[in-house]
Curated annotation (Swiss-Prot):
The keyword ATP-binding does not apply. SMART domains: Lactamase_B (SM00849). Zn(2+) 2 binds at residues 59-60, 134, 172. Pathway: Secondary metabolite metabolism; methylglyoxal degradation; (R)-lactate from methylglyoxal: step 2/2. This is Hydroxyacylglutathione hydrolase. Its cofactor is Zn(2+).
Length: 263
Protein backbone atom coordinates (compact mmCIF):
# COMPACT_ATOMS: atom_id res chain seq x y z
CA UNK A 1 0.00 0.00 0.00
CA UNK A 2 1.25 3.47 -0.90
CA UNK A 3 1.02 5.97 1.93
CA UNK A 4 1.48 9.69 1.38
CA UNK A 5 2.27 11.97 4.29
CA UNK A 6 2.62 15.73 4.45
CA UNK A 7 5.53 17.46 6.15
CA UNK A 8 4.82 21.13 6.76
CA UNK A 9 7.59 23.56 5.83
CA UNK A 10 7.96 27.34 5.94
CA UNK A 11 4.63 29.17 6.13
CA UNK A 12 2.51 27.10 3.77
CA UNK A 13 4.61 24.50 1.92
CA UNK A 14 3.91 20.80 1.92
CA UNK A 15 6.72 18.30 1.36
CA UNK A 16 5.16 14.98 0.41
CA UNK A 17 6.58 11.67 1.67
CA UNK A 18 5.88 8.54 -0.40
CA UNK A 19 6.19 5.16 1.29
CA UNK A 20 5.27 1.78 -0.17
CA UNK A 21 4.50 -0.49 2.77
CA UNK A 22 6.21 -2.52 4.16
CA UNK A 23 9.39 -0.82 2.91
CA UNK A 24 11.09 1.70 5.15
CA UNK A 25 12.69 3.48 2.19
CA UNK A 26 10.81 6.61 1.14
CA UNK A 27 10.82 9.37 -1.46
CA UNK A 28 10.12 13.03 -0.84
CA UNK A 29 8.65 15.55 -3.26
CA UNK A 30 10.05 19.10 -3.39
CA UNK A 31 12.03 19.24 -0.13
CA UNK A 32 12.63 22.96 0.27
CA UNK A 33 13.71 22.44 3.89
CA UNK A 34 15.99 19.54 4.80
CA UNK A 35 15.67 19.84 8.57
CA UNK A 36 11.97 18.97 8.75
CA UNK A 37 12.54 16.00 6.43
CA UNK A 38 15.42 14.69 8.53
CA UNK A 39 13.36 15.08 11.70
CA UNK A 40 10.53 13.10 10.12
CA UNK A 41 12.83 10.34 8.86
CA UNK A 42 14.49 9.87 12.23
CA UNK A 43 11.25 10.02 14.20
CA UNK A 44 9.78 7.28 12.01
CA UNK A 45 12.95 5.22 11.45
CA UNK A 46 12.84 5.69 7.69
CA UNK A 47 15.56 5.86 5.04
CA UNK A 48 15.49 8.40 2.24
CA UNK A 49 15.75 6.61 -1.11
CA UNK A 50 15.28 9.57 -3.41
CA UNK A 51 13.86 12.98 -4.22
CA UNK A 52 11.32 14.08 -6.82
CA UNK A 53 11.55 17.73 -7.90
CA UNK A 54 8.90 19.57 -9.91
CA UNK A 55 10.71 22.85 -10.63
CA UNK A 56 13.65 25.00 -9.65
CA UNK A 57 12.25 27.43 -7.07
CA UNK A 58 14.22 27.38 -3.83
CA UNK A 59 11.26 26.61 -1.57
CA UNK A 60 11.07 23.30 -3.47
CA UNK A 61 14.77 22.52 -3.92
CA UNK A 62 16.55 24.23 -1.02
CA UNK A 63 16.97 21.07 1.03
CA UNK A 64 18.47 18.87 -1.67
CA UNK A 65 22.16 19.43 -0.92
CA UNK A 66 21.74 18.89 2.83
CA UNK A 67 19.68 15.74 2.28
CA UNK A 68 22.34 14.39 -0.07
CA UNK A 69 24.97 15.03 2.59
CA UNK A 70 22.79 13.47 5.28
CA UNK A 71 22.02 10.31 3.35
CA UNK A 72 24.32 7.36 3.89
CA UNK A 73 23.57 6.20 0.35
CA UNK A 74 23.86 8.24 -2.80
CA UNK A 75 20.41 9.69 -3.32
CA UNK A 76 18.56 9.41 -6.58
CA UNK A 77 17.32 12.91 -7.38
CA UNK A 78 14.82 13.28 -10.21
CA UNK A 79 13.89 16.60 -11.77
CA UNK A 80 13.25 18.43 -15.04
CA UNK A 81 16.08 18.23 -17.54
CA UNK A 82 15.63 21.81 -18.79
CA UNK A 83 15.84 23.70 -15.50
CA UNK A 84 19.04 24.52 -13.65
CA UNK A 85 18.80 22.60 -10.39
CA UNK A 86 21.89 21.56 -8.46
CA UNK A 87 21.97 17.94 -7.34
CA UNK A 88 19.77 16.26 -9.94
CA UNK A 89 21.17 12.81 -10.72
CA UNK A 90 18.42 11.71 -13.08
CA UNK A 91 17.19 14.54 -15.33
CA UNK A 92 13.75 13.78 -16.73
CA UNK A 93 12.21 14.50 -20.09
CA UNK A 94 8.53 13.59 -20.26
CA UNK A 95 8.68 13.09 -24.01
CA UNK A 96 11.72 10.82 -24.00
CA UNK A 97 10.88 8.94 -20.80
CA UNK A 98 7.24 9.45 -19.79
CA UNK A 99 7.18 6.49 -17.40
CA UNK A 100 9.66 4.66 -15.20
CA UNK A 101 9.85 2.51 -12.08
CA UNK A 102 11.01 3.78 -8.70
CA UNK A 103 12.87 1.39 -6.42
CA UNK A 104 10.73 0.26 -3.46
CA UNK A 105 7.55 1.42 -5.21
CA UNK A 106 4.82 -0.57 -6.94
CA UNK A 107 3.66 0.56 -10.34
CA UNK A 108 5.00 3.08 -12.79
CA UNK A 109 5.69 6.74 -12.14
CA UNK A 110 4.39 8.95 -14.94
CA UNK A 111 6.08 12.26 -15.78
CA UNK A 112 4.05 15.13 -17.26
CA UNK A 113 5.32 18.35 -18.83
CA UNK A 114 3.32 21.19 -17.24
CA UNK A 115 5.08 24.47 -18.08
CA UNK A 116 3.60 27.79 -17.07
CA UNK A 117 4.64 28.57 -13.51
CA UNK A 118 8.20 27.92 -14.69
CA UNK A 119 9.41 27.02 -18.16
CA UNK A 120 10.37 23.44 -17.32
CA UNK A 121 7.87 22.53 -14.59
CA UNK A 122 6.95 18.84 -14.47
CA UNK A 123 4.43 16.81 -12.49
CA UNK A 124 4.35 13.20 -11.34
CA UNK A 125 1.56 10.64 -11.23
CA UNK A 126 1.84 7.38 -9.30
CA UNK A 127 -1.17 5.15 -8.67
CA UNK A 128 -4.05 7.60 -8.12
CA UNK A 129 -1.86 10.44 -6.83
CA UNK A 130 -0.78 13.57 -8.71
CA UNK A 131 2.14 15.67 -7.45
CA UNK A 132 1.78 18.91 -9.36
CA UNK A 133 4.06 21.35 -7.52
CA UNK A 134 2.93 24.90 -8.22
CA UNK A 135 0.96 24.24 -11.41
CA UNK A 136 -2.46 23.28 -10.06
CA UNK A 137 -3.62 24.36 -6.61
CA UNK A 138 -6.93 23.62 -4.99
CA UNK A 139 -9.27 26.28 -6.43
CA UNK A 140 -6.35 27.97 -8.17
CA UNK A 141 -3.17 27.71 -10.22
CA UNK A 142 0.38 28.99 -10.04
CA UNK A 143 1.53 32.43 -11.10
CA UNK A 144 3.15 32.71 -14.51
CA UNK A 145 6.74 33.52 -13.62
CA UNK A 146 8.29 32.15 -16.81
CA UNK A 147 5.67 30.52 -18.99
CA UNK A 148 2.85 31.91 -21.09
CA UNK A 149 -0.89 31.82 -20.43
CA UNK A 150 -1.25 29.38 -23.34
CA UNK A 151 1.29 27.03 -21.77
CA UNK A 152 -0.40 27.15 -18.38
CA UNK A 153 -3.86 26.64 -19.82
CA UNK A 154 -2.60 23.64 -21.79
CA UNK A 155 -0.91 22.24 -18.67
CA UNK A 156 -4.08 22.62 -16.60
CA UNK A 157 -6.21 21.05 -19.31
CA UNK A 158 -3.80 18.11 -19.39
CA UNK A 159 -4.15 17.63 -15.63
CA UNK A 160 -7.93 18.01 -15.79
CA UNK A 161 -8.05 15.02 -18.14
CA UNK A 162 -6.63 12.67 -15.49
CA UNK A 163 -9.13 10.24 -13.91
CA UNK A 164 -11.70 12.00 -11.74
CA UNK A 165 -10.63 10.17 -8.57
CA UNK A 166 -6.98 11.25 -8.93
CA UNK A 167 -5.85 12.85 -5.68
CA UNK A 168 -4.20 16.24 -6.14
CA UNK A 169 -1.12 16.83 -3.96
CA UNK A 170 -0.03 20.39 -4.64
CA UNK A 171 2.84 22.05 -2.80
CA UNK A 172 1.10 24.87 -0.92
CA UNK A 173 -1.81 25.45 1.43
CA UNK A 174 -3.29 28.30 -0.60
CA UNK A 175 -6.85 26.99 -0.62
CA UNK A 176 -8.67 29.62 1.43
CA UNK A 177 -7.18 32.56 -0.45
CA UNK A 178 -7.90 30.81 -3.74
CA UNK A 179 -11.48 30.20 -2.67
CA UNK A 180 -12.04 33.88 -1.94
CA UNK A 181 -11.11 34.67 -5.52
CA UNK A 182 -13.08 31.74 -6.94
CA UNK A 183 -16.21 32.90 -5.12
CA UNK A 184 -15.71 36.42 -6.45
CA UNK A 185 -15.74 35.20 -10.05
CA UNK A 186 -18.17 32.28 -9.69
CA UNK A 187 -20.43 33.23 -6.75
CA UNK A 188 -23.42 31.04 -7.64
CA UNK A 189 -21.46 27.79 -7.88
CA UNK A 190 -23.03 25.60 -5.19
CA UNK A 191 -20.19 23.06 -5.23
CA UNK A 192 -17.77 25.92 -4.67
CA UNK A 193 -19.84 27.29 -1.79
CA UNK A 194 -19.98 23.88 -0.13
CA UNK A 195 -16.26 23.31 -0.55
CA UNK A 196 -15.50 26.72 0.92
CA UNK A 197 -17.44 25.78 4.06
CA UNK A 198 -15.54 22.51 4.38
CA UNK A 199 -12.17 24.14 3.77
CA UNK A 200 -12.79 26.89 6.33
CA UNK A 201 -13.75 24.26 8.90
CA UNK A 202 -10.60 22.25 8.20
CA UNK A 203 -8.30 25.25 8.51
CA UNK A 204 -9.94 26.31 11.78
CA UNK A 205 -8.77 22.93 13.11
CA UNK A 206 -5.32 23.46 11.55
CA UNK A 207 -6.00 20.55 9.18
CA UNK A 208 -4.86 20.42 5.57
CA UNK A 209 -7.28 20.93 2.71
CA UNK A 210 -4.92 18.91 0.53
CA UNK A 211 -5.24 16.47 -1.16
CA UNK A 212 -8.04 17.59 -3.39
CA UNK A 213 -9.28 15.52 -6.33
CA UNK A 214 -9.47 16.14 -10.05
CA UNK A 215 -13.26 15.76 -9.86
CA UNK A 216 -13.49 18.49 -7.24
CA UNK A 217 -11.18 20.82 -9.13
CA UNK A 218 -13.18 20.38 -12.32
CA UNK A 219 -16.25 21.49 -10.37
CA UNK A 220 -14.85 24.45 -8.41
CA UNK A 221 -11.55 25.68 -9.85
CA UNK A 222 -12.11 28.79 -12.02
CA UNK A 223 -8.87 28.20 -13.93
CA UNK A 224 -10.24 24.87 -15.16
CA UNK A 225 -13.56 26.51 -15.99
CA UNK A 226 -12.56 29.74 -17.73
CA UNK A 227 -15.26 29.27 -20.37
CA UNK A 228 -18.08 28.87 -17.81
CA UNK A 229 -20.84 31.39 -18.53
CA UNK A 230 -20.86 33.01 -15.10
CA UNK A 231 -17.06 33.24 -15.00
CA UNK A 232 -16.96 34.79 -18.47
CA UNK A 233 -19.59 37.33 -17.40
CA UNK A 234 -17.54 38.16 -14.30
CA UNK A 235 -14.42 38.66 -16.40
CA UNK A 236 -16.25 40.97 -18.80
CA UNK A 237 -17.68 42.99 -15.92
CA UNK A 238 -14.33 43.28 -14.13
CA UNK A 239 -12.50 44.27 -17.31
CA UNK A 240 -15.35 46.42 -18.60
CA UNK A 241 -12.98 48.83 -20.36
CA UNK A 242 -11.84 46.11 -22.80
CA UNK A 243 -13.46 44.91 -26.01
CA UNK A 244 -14.63 41.36 -25.38
CA UNK A 245 -16.22 40.73 -28.77
CA UNK A 246 -13.79 37.90 -29.58
CA UNK A 247 -13.02 36.63 -26.07
CA UNK A 248 -12.05 32.97 -26.36
CA UNK A 249 -11.05 30.51 -23.62
CA UNK A 250 -7.38 31.51 -23.71
CA UNK A 251 -8.28 35.19 -23.58
CA UNK A 252 -10.59 34.57 -20.65
CA UNK A 253 -7.96 32.51 -18.86
CA UNK A 254 -5.34 35.22 -19.40
CA UNK A 255 -7.59 37.89 -17.92
CA UNK A 256 -8.58 35.59 -15.06
CA UNK A 257 -4.93 35.05 -14.13
CA UNK A 258 -4.29 38.80 -14.38
CA UNK A 259 -7.26 39.46 -12.11
CA UNK A 260 -6.03 36.92 -9.54
CA UNK A 261 -2.53 38.43 -9.59
CA UNK A 262 -4.00 41.72 -8.38
CA UNK A 263 -6.80 40.35 -6.21
Amino acid sequence: MLTITAIKAFNDNYIWVLQQQPHTQVYVVDPGDASVVIDYLEANQLTLAGILLTHHHNDHTGGVAELQAYSQNRLTVYGPDNEKIEGITHPLNATAQPRFILDYMSGELQVLDVPGHTAGHIAYVIADALFCGDTLFSAGCGRLFEGTPAQMLNSLQQLAQLPADTRVYCAHEYTLSNLKFALAVNPNNRALQDYNERAVALRRQDKATIPSTIALERAINPFLRASDTEIVDSIKQHFSDLNHANLDELGGFTLLRQWKDNF
